[in-house]
Amino acid sequence: MTQTLSIPLIGLDETFPDELFVLHHPATDRYGCFHHDGVHGLACFSSETGAFRFAEWIDLSGMATKQISFDEAREIAKARPLPVVSLMLLDDIHNPQIHFVR
């Protein structure tokens, strides 16, 4: 008898938007990052409003929002030093979508 999986596979129905907003500090060329459940990632948002709220929450001056493509966000995350290993879509900060880049 063959058994089939009756629940969805985790992560297969989650997608990242084609365009994202990140927080960038132009003077130092650093980006806003986030740590969730032991995973470090580049913080990204589907709206500029979400990015602004995160900037207010982390209370770092000089941060600017930057609209970039998903592929550009992946490259930025890959270029960040360890421990950054992912993109984190923080539209729901308590349950971020994580896309590993390394």
Feature map (PLM): residue ranges:
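Conserved NAD+-utilizing ADP-ribose enzyme module
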Residues: M1-R102
